[in-house]
Every structure is written in structure tokens, then in C-alpha cells.
Swiss-Prot record:
The keyword Cytoplasm applies. It catalyses: pseudouridine(1915) in 23S rRNA + S-adenosyl-L-methionine = N(3)-methylpseudouridine(1915) in 23S rRNA + S-adenosyl-L-homocysteine + H(+). Homodimer. S-adenosyl-L-methionine binds at L76, G108, F127, S128, K129, M130, T131, F132. Pfam families: SPOUT_MTase. It comes from the Bacteria. This is Ribosomal RNA large subunit methyltransferase H. GO terms for molecular function: rRNA (pseudouridine-N3-)-methyltransferase activity. The gene is rlmH. It is found in: Cytoplasm.
Length: 159
């Protein structure tokens, strides 16, 4: 299974990069992981809704260039479906059983994802009604993917 994580911006904080590297290494036993960083846009303080839409559209265009035909696209969205770790594991397992060999997970930038990306997604996933920093979300997402593979393999993993 190939798993792509697509997100705007670079992770700058060393501790987050270290965590991303650790989970990437752990996941290498289970899947082919590809982290795709697209250029992000600077969001001015107190930007109007129109400016926010333009920023999301530009980031969305960059993200869309990496979405592959035949891939199952999961967009992280606050209004998406919340799953337990076991349910996410079952979803990944079910996709594999149905012949899906490529999953792309998309994380939005600091103001979220463009509507075009949300419409293109095959599934909207929410981790919470709360908002998380998009750089931290990469670590959380990687940990949950790793946990899903451990669950599917019947291997122990701390709770």
C-alpha cells in the first residue's frame, strides 16, 4: 500500500520533524510512505473572507497537482467523520481488500482546505471538532496510521 500525506508548508520545529521521522521509519515496515509538502501562502492577520478564499484556492491548486487518479483521497476536515483508531484501521484494511493500493491523505494549511479539494475527496476525516496546528497534525496523523497498521497486524501497541 502506498500512503501519501499531502500538506502545505514545511515543518520547521525540530521536535516535530523528529517525530515525523520516527513514525516514517516505523511505518516503512507496513507501507510505502510519501510526504509531499506544497508551498504554503502567508495569511495576513485579520484577512477578509475573500482573501482567505484566494489563499485556500492557491494552496488547493498546488495540492490538486499531486492527487492521483485511482488513489483513494482522504481530506482532513473539521466537519468530516470522526473514527476511532480501530475504525480507521478497519477502513485502511477494507480499502486494501477492495483493491485500493494508494491512499492520499490531505491536510489543509492554517486556514483549512479549499472546497475543490473537499469535493474531490472520497472521504472526509475529522480528528476532533477542535482545530490543531497543521504541522502538529502531521505527527498525529502519522501516529494514527502507524497504530492502524499495528492493529491490523494484530501486534501490541500501547494505548
Amino acid at each position: 500500500m502506498q500512503i501519501d500525506i499531502i500538506a502545505p508548508g514545511r515543518v520547521k520545529e525540530r521536535y516535530l520533524r523528529d517525530a515525523i521521522d520516527e513514525y516514517s521509519k516505523r511505518l516503512s515496515r507496513y507501507c510505502k510512505l510519501n510526504i509531499i509538502e506544497v508551498a504554503d501562502e502567508k495569511t495576513p492577520d485579520h484577512a477578509s473572507e475573500g482573501v482567505d478564499r484566494q489563499i485556500k484556492a492557491r494552496e488547493g491548486e498546488r495540492i490538486a497537482k499531486h492527487l492521483k487518479d485511482g488513489a483513494f483521497v482522504i481530506a482532513l476536515a473539521i466537519n468530516g467523520k470522526q473514527l476511532s483508531s480501530e475504525e480507521l484501521a478497519a477502513k485502511i484494511n477494507d480499502l486494501g481488500l477492495r483493491g485500493t493500493s494508494h491512499i492520499q491523505l490531505v491536510i489543509g494549511g492554517s486556514i483549512g482546505l479549499d472546497d475543490a479539494i473537499l469535493r474531490r475527496a472520497d472521504f472526509l476525516l475529522s480528528f476532533s471538532k477542535m482545530t490543531f496546528p497543521h504541522q502538529l497534525m502531521r505527527v498525529i496523523l502519522l501516529e494514527q496510521i502507524y497504530r492502524a497498521y499495528k492493529i491490523n497486524a494484530g501486534e501490541p501497541y500501547h494505548k
